[in-house]
Amino acid sequence: MADFETTVYNDQTFTEVWAYAWCRLGAENVTIGDNIYDFFNDMINQAFDKNIIVFFHNLKFDGSFLLNFMLSQDTFKQATYQDRHGDWHFKKSDELKNGEFSYMISDMGQWYDIALKWHGHLITFRDSLKLLPFSVAKIGKDFSTKHQKTSIEYTGERHAGGVITDEERQYIANDVLVMSEALQIFFKLAENKPTIGSCCMHDYRKMTKKEDWEADFPDMYDEPIDPKAFDAENADQYIRRSYKGGWVYVVEGKENKIFTKGVTADVNSLYPSMMSSQSGNFYPVGVPRFYKGDTISKQYLDKTKYYYFVRIRTRFYLKQGKLPFIVINGSWRYPSRTPLKSSDVLDENGEYCEYIRTESGEIEDTSVVLTLTCTDWELLQEHYNLIDCQILDYCVFKAKIGIFDTYIDKYSKIKKESKGAKRQVAKLFLNNLYGKMAQSTNSSFKIARLSDGVLKFTTQKANDRKPMYIPIGSAITSYSRAFTIRAAQKNFHGVGERGFIYADTDSIHCDLPPAEVQGIEIHPVDFCCWKLENYWDKAIFVRAKTYIEHTTHEDGEKVNPYYLIKCAGMSKGAKENFNNMLISGEASLTDFKVGLEVDGKLLPKQIKGGTLLVETTFKIHPKK
């Protein structure tokens, strides 16, 4: 386990490692040094007679210093090559020659690993944040590690080769000792894989017979279909259009208002609940059959035997008193990530239009083509009036229940019977299998270079990753959305009435006393049940993932009241600053709105040497 401390001072144009620390997993002896050259020498010496894996907690930050250093040294060479089509590739790690290095940075900027070959052995730098996705402080607390994170003043004149004080040594040593102990515990319970998702999938596959896996989860890319008939080249492409995330929604008309005396209810492990047979949910398996036609055969409506995906063309209008959930991303007609009340298009005057003029000047109606799971299709008919609705085609799978039970039951039992680290690891394994099921072939990655000493990146498109089984990935998230939406609907009594206000994936927020929350079963731990996570005496909900609740109770027990601030993109420092403003009276809840500016945001910026966290102002911008 390793960690870098890097320079932060005023008017900085160059950054460097002024302190590093590393230790073996589970060991108490920490090696501390004062420059990146010595760090590399340490790692090379450790890898003299064996391959080693070195973890950093947030490789995106520390890794920028590693790449910057290696790209600036003639000793090391980036292991890239071009094929005859002009596309770039990295050599595989077992093909590297001495002094060559490769790395995996996704097209979305996720850093996974950096591999360097030296003395015939591999030094692989990995990101422990991909295994334990929490801060070092939280990991130390949750895992009850012997050592706990401390703090120092980050800003100040420090440089490579300088004096490291005893306080600074203690600080950086504690960081690696916390993570060293936590990872040692983790690897006693899990395989050494690059991400928590891959750990989960590895464990799940071990529980599944090879012949069952091949029969239940075939490669959907290997199932070609007629693109002229189904507007897709294979089953994966057809079904993937139905794949959506969680339902996040503030009731229109309840935004930016102060609500009082409310409660927030959370589902106990939403995705594992929906995957468990306790939910009654059946899941698609095997190879689909595709059909054209404007009706779905009656036999396929039996959800205990079949699961289907359907493609429709329709206009839709929200029914009176119902909550919206249809989201259409990637279209100029509609705002992204926004549940829609209608397929009609809002003009510049805020009026809905049933017809639009295209760029070519043609007039067309606002009908849309949607690919839906059977769960979403049923919910669509419950919540919307459908006009000129036509089923274009559909595909049908055989359905099974309980295919995740062995896995879910294993980690549910550990979670219920354990405390501390073991319980936290069980929670990670419960909550991180579902996303891996939706893995696509997209393996696009970034290639780094130095431009005037600053790290720059170019994206190379690639599609050679082994996909998982999108039918189940889509079905899991669909069942989960429906579970939350139906609970919210039972507590929605109108815009001007007390009741449901906001939902975020696995939670509903209502200005109701706990006894008046309807349609949900309350239990502290059971699957498919809800717990009343917190009571609040006042709250404001601005938009998706942007709200504040003044919490008075947690899990039904009184606590010292505090402001729970949730705001996408708002750093911990900015939240602390605004919290202090609320406590002092300098700000009120109504100041939490579009246009708010608060100091304390740290913005990563590439400069010579590596990444600098630049303090700037956080602002709630209007939604694009």
Label the predicted regions.
Residues N10-N58, S64-K624:
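Conserved acidic
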Residues D3-N10:
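Ser/Thr-glycine-rich phosphate-binding loops at phosphate-binding pockets of nucleotides
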